[in-house]
């Protein structure tokens, strides 16, 4: 799946999601992996510098706590999940780099995406280290 804020349709007047888009490739797996992919959006340019309180958006930690309260799960070490998601994105961008190299990339921004492989890999390793990897 591709569960993130820009793949959601929100109700026009109520604080609720009406639809989730881009789930044609969804799989069964650890639900926290998908949820933490959503949580990563808090660190991306769209939300990173926004006044979340003024927008009535919970902080990253608050959102994790709400999700875990609703699902009955304990809040895990999110660093492992962020590392996993960043590593997965690095793999995707490496695939894009291969298509750029082979001349089969369809997206006009493919080269820009491919350039993210190393920074995503480094960020993944940093989160893994925060979670205890050596």
Feature map (PLM): residue ranges:
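Active-site activation/catalytic loop segments of kinase-like enzymes and analogous catalytic loops
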Residues: 32-71, 85-103
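Regulatory N- and C-terminal appendages and interdomain linkers associated
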Residues: 99-134
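Short, surface-exposed helix-loop/turn micro-motifs enriched in polar/charged residues
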Residues: 17, 27, 52-55, 75-78
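Short, conserved loop/turn and helix-capping segments at secondary-structure boundaries
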Residues: 29, 33, 57, 107, ...
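All-alpha amphipathic helical-bundle segments outside canonical DNA-binding/catalytic cores
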Residues: 73-85
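Short amphipathic alpha-helical segments and their helix-coil junctions
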Residues: 17-21, 59-74, 119-120
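Active-site acidic catalytic loop and adjacent metal/ATP-binding pocket
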Residues: 1-33, 37-39
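A generic structural signal for secondary-structure junctions
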Residues: 13, 25, 40-44, 68, ...
């Amino acid at each position: 799946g591709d569960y993130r804020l820009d793949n959601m349709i929100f109700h026009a007047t109520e604080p609720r999601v009406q639809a989730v888009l881009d789930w044609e490739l969804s799989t069964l797996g650890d639900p926290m992996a998908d949820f933490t992919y959503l949580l990563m959006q808090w660190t991306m340019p769209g939300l990173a510098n926004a006044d979340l309180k003024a927008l009535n958006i919970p902080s990253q930690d608050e959102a994790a706590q709400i999700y875990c309260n609703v699902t009955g799960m304990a809040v895990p070490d999110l660093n492992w999940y962020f590392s996993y998601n960043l590593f997965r994105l690095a793999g995707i961008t490496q695939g894009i780099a291969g298509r750029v190299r082979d001349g089969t990339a369809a997206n006009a921004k493919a080269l820009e995406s491919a350039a993210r492989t190393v920074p995503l890999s480094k960020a993944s390793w940093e989160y893994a280290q925060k979670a205890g990897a050596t």
